[in-house]
């Protein structure tokens, strides 16, 4: 409710600014398989003190062949110490840059950036104060070749332990399905309200997973809008090119022969001109074969947020940069359903365009299709695949009324890149499972994993060229000077394109919501 209020208030402000500005201007002039759950043996209960590390994670930070960003929290203001060990358990001496410990929301935040690691190696690590340390975690470094494997999830967005554990089961099954996954992209909305209580529950459910991987996090609206600084204080990221860090972080990194940019769609409610410029320069500064963009809000959706202008504005603003820079894949979350477009360029199906994937939700909050959006906010001819996890419906090329009971569950996605081939698989971890006779039974310890969408992108490698070599940072002055035209850009879209579509859509909306018992 709070997020909807913020969105409506921002839209009203947009309309007021534009109308006021206009007055001023006038006056002046597939198959299902059973995957065994990962068994984690019970460890002896550790003694918890104010120096005990919690909320531990490793994030991409800088050169993925040699660097990692580690973060953890403590209840007391203690020293920061990180120990790194090689595959044989021997301690290795590598540079560690410790940030000053600072207090945030009643706890103390520790950030340490590790550099000087060897490429293509597995390391273990522990964090602490020099006398008390965490359990050991592990990570791998990129070996720099043209092969990589990683997981993609979105929208855990829970507020109680049971739902966090349900999402953790989905993610754990993902790593069990792709045991060679080197890192995990999370497309935003880690919790529902970004409170200490919820982040502690997230940590309780996810800590054993987060200890064994590297995260590339994306800021969701529940991580940034109205909950300032939480996102940047939950991960240790390279913020050197981020246009602002208050409600999210934009950054990029190379992994193998892919260049991946993370965009903050909380920035001025949707996206600022400064960030669009950053993305264009960033994508033009790489000669990697694969260009991938990750963000939270989705320009292509049939979910409940597909009726608002902040996400739809991305279809006008961000997609223009995607088209200009020959991006291959755009991944997003936000609308808690799975949707893949045909390859799109200049708003039309084009085999040379980018594929947009709304990556579903790993969590339990799932949205169905808003039928009134069809033809007004989303052209169904652009859909290649669609799965709604709340009711198991899926797209058959013409309609989404087909149902598969096994599609009711949490989604994880896998990406495998091998030179000029990118393979994308999307799986549903069913809330329910089949018995030996094929009957649907209650969820058990061996989750049913169903491949519900798969596609492959292929291209000739070595074709991308670097066309930008300048400074891609944004000063505070540049950002705030550009904020007003950025806001007017969203407002102009709201008045000139979104509002007429809403008026045209109203009859369909009323029929669907009032007479067909649909959801708004």
Q: Would you name each region that the model predicts?
A:
Residues 42-218, 224-249, 277-281, 309-324, ...:
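Divalent metal-dependent phosphoesterase catalytic cores across multiple superfamilies
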Residues 156, 221, 266, 297:
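Residue-level signal for short, function-critical loop segments
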Residues 184, 215, 289-295:
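Generic beta-sheet signal
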Residues 115-119, 220, 357, 415-418:
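Conserved beta strand-loop-helix elements of the APE1-like EEP
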Residues 4-25:
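Sec-dependent N-terminal signal peptides of Gram-positive bacterial secreted proteins and lipoproteins
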Residues 180, 212, 287-288, 332:
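Active-site acidic short loop of glycosyltransferases
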